[in-house]
């Protein structure tokens, strides 16, 4: 119970601390937002004060200009044409209207654009810098009278232009030596067949040796009678048939995948005496020192499982006829020899994988 109370107190304390922290952050942000809201009001007030001061200054300047303009009218009657361009201050009488609205002060700027007419005044001196005025033929229509003056100056550079084609003539002579160089690549084509001779060396396809690398082996074991004895043919043929062997090709017995004699051959059984064949009709009267069981690897299915079935068949026949199981050298079968057979089978499987 005490532990539960401690856990509850710890959880409640943690929740209270988190609530205090959240409340503190919320209040601080609220204060900051109120401070930022007050600032734009102060800025607006300061801007309003500045705008009022500017209006007052503009009004003062407008009054001053009115006093100056009557002084300019006196020289205007005295000097005449020399002071004609000074008429621009007449447009400055508009500042009194700025007291009511400051926006008409801006349209005064386009009124100052009449300096464009003085650009047309230099039209008479353009006759001398006619070459410079050439890029602006579209603006000056009276230039058709000037073209007869320009051809007098242009024939001089025209005389220099025929000098330029003179260096072009030697360039035409250069391709002539290039023509004898073109037959040079022809002997190169003749040298290419010499290089093509080693090409027949490239078709080296060692694909043929790959099937030769396929390893094969034959596992052999014997079922023989004891020293100085022989196996009875009638008992032997009965044990062979009970082991699942069927008489077939090459006049020997074969163990098929299925005991009824169907399917691929797993291993075979032959007579130990040459030529190694059997005669089923006279086999009951036959006597033999033993039989040989052999399996070719690789074979159908799992070779290790086929080897176990082969060993079981040999032991069954040996028990039925009263013989022993021997290895390929006709020695007693040992566990070491069996492992050797299995290693040979694995080696062939790995090589052919």
Swiss-Prot record:
Amino acid composition bias (Pro residues), ranges on this chain: 112-134, 177-186, 200-209
GO BP, sorted A to Z: division septum assembly; FtsZ-dependent cytokinesis
Biased composition regions of type Acidic residues, renumbered to the chain: 49-60
Chain residue ranges for the region called Disordered: 42-214
Compositional bias (Low complexity): 151-163, 187-199
Keyword field: Cell cycle, Cell division, Cell inner membrane, Cell membrane, Membrane, Transmembrane, Transmembrane helix
Cytoplasmic side: 28-353
TM stretches of this protein: 7-27
Subcellular locations according to the entry: Cell inner membrane
Function according to Swiss-Prot or TrEMBL: Essential cell division protein that stabilizes the FtsZ protofilaments by cross-linking them and that serves as a cytoplasmic membrane anchor for the Z ring. Also required for the recruitment to the septal ring of downstream cell division proteins.
Complexes and interactors: Interacts with FtsZ via their C-terminal domains.
Family: Belongs to the ZipA family.
Name assigned to this protein: Cell division protein ZipA
Organism of derivation: Klebsiella pneumoniae subsp. pneumoniae (strain ATCC 700721 / MGH 78578)
Gene (UniProt): zipA
